[in-house]
């Protein structure tokens, strides 16, 4: 598997783990919300039952409550509700006068201190559910509780209405003199002014006597080079000079090319030669004598025909 595959698998695994963590967090929040809702429902049931009992007491003429929900067990004989115990045969009997108040009963024993109840529901919602006349039940105000902790900072309020413009302020004191500004641009040339009045005539002076000659001045700087002059005329030929010293011998020349072949010569005359000696018989042993030598080496020039 390539590196890209490992990276993709790692990303998928992280996504699955984050999803499982988010699901567990959501389930925990849902369970806590369910417990809170059930607690509020139980509180509402308790308040509803208490309010119903109070309404029954207000509606009963004797101030006693009637057992609306009969017991599931068998009731005793001749036990009736505390509201009325009239004869069953009487029909339309008027109510009798109220009896004298009974003797005050003995003070009962103090009950055990009960557990602290849960926080009650909002009075406005209770009045809306049970239609209590006059709105909320008028209960005596309890003692002031201890000051609570400082609450969190509330949300930012809406922008306020734009206020009216205030009166104009007084003129401020003159500030210190600022630094000198930059030199401005040169203005346009002005018009020529009018001619002024003639001046007073000047004093006439006569030329004075000639002064003594001054000292020689310093040498001036060298002048610029002059232009080239025109070429002069050729001079006359001078006398012949004495002969010079002989020069040294020159180097040998390179060998020349071979000459052409000469023409063939004329045919020469035949040379003279000595005649051969006479032969002898073969049977006779003889010794040939050499021919006499001649001045031409034994041969003579022969003539050519």
Curated annotation (Swiss-Prot):
GO terms for cellular component: collagen trimer. It comes from the Eukaryota. SMART domains: Col_cuticle_N. Residues 96-125, 142-204, 208-252, 256-270 are annotated as: Triple-helical region. Residues 278-288 have a biased composition (Basic and acidic residues). Residues 150-162 have a biased composition (Low complexity). InterPro entries: Col_cuticle_N. One of its GO terms (molecular function) is structural constituent of cuticle. Keywords: Collagen, Cuticle, Disulfide bond, Repeat. It holds the Pfam family Col_cuticle_N. Belongs to the cuticular collagen family. Nematode cuticles are composed largely of collagen-like proteins. The cuticle functions both as an exoskeleton and as a barrier to protect the worm from its environment. This is Putative cuticle collagen 90.
